[in-house]
Amino acid sequence: MIKKLSLFLSFLMALSLSSAVFATSAERDEGIKCISKGSWQTALYDKDRNGRDVYTNIRVGDSYKGGQCMGRCGGACGGWAPSAWTKDCLDHDICIVDQNGENGLAWDKNCGDEFNHAADDYTFGVWRGCRG
């Protein structure tokens, strides 16, 4: 059990490190950066993997063009499990709404790199205290 958990954590760490290597000059994996619900943040994503950078000012937790709970890691707004509120998840959320994300996952042609940046936030954000 511990060996499997260790292998899984190693995989996630490698995934987060590899996504930082392929980021554009302005857009980077910010690690796990907690953000507070209700605060104003500037979301950043690049169009079409390494394309033009897009910046959007938004209040964390607000709805945006039909998307809800901007900045909350994971799908939807509710649920029984605690969730993290982070900058990388905000970047991914805004990208998915603006670019009509195909599936929101790592292989999404527009927002896959943002998904990779947010993967460690989703997995470890609550442990790091990013509860909004």
Where do the PLM segments sit?
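Bacterial N-terminal signal peptides that target proteins for export
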Residues: 1-9
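Extended terminal accessory/targeting regions
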Residues: 22-132
